[in-house]
């Protein structure tokens, strides 16, 4: 289930696909939409095929580096309200240190490389484009 989705992320479903008797450590990272001031939601958009291919490439690279680990990534697209998860990364490995390391590696690489754009939706109905690091784009590109 390494994919993009427009539905709510089910951690239970992801865990059901990854846990096994060979992996004693499982790390789950959830990135949730937070209320920065007057933000009510974030609208995530992507060129789906390119984003899917990059997720697969990122997982393949991590699997080559940590062959005993299993990794699942799921990223939401569309409008995600405050408090809901926009991304889930689940990494299972024989031991907890490896699971934590893989999970951290994945979120850092995703933030650098995954071509997904976000637009903050504000309580007053306006929206602001945000770069992948979370900073508003210079010039304050704000839609009304």
Where are these regions (language model features)?
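N-terminal, polar/charged subdomain of small-to-medium soluble alpha/beta proteins
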Residues: 1-85, 92-104, 108-144
């Amino acid at each position: 289930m390494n994919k993009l989705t427009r539905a709510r992320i089910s951690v239970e479903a992801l865990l059901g696909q990854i846990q096994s008797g060979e992996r004693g450590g499982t790390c789950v990272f959830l990135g949730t939409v937070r209320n920065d001031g007057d933000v009510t939601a974030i609208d995530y958009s992507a060129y789906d095929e390119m984003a899917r291919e990059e997720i697969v490439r990122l997982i393949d690279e991590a699997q080559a580096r940590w062959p005993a680990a299993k990794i699942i990534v799921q990223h939401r697209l569309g409008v995600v309200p405050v408090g809901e998860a926009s991304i889930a990364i689940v990494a299972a490995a024989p031991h907890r240190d490896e699971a934590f390391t893989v999970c951290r590696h994945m979120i850092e690489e995703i933030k650098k490389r995954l071509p997904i754009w976000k637009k903050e939706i504000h309580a007053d109905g306006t929206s602001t484009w945000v770069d992948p690091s979370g900073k508003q784009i210079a010039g304050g590109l704000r839609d009304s």
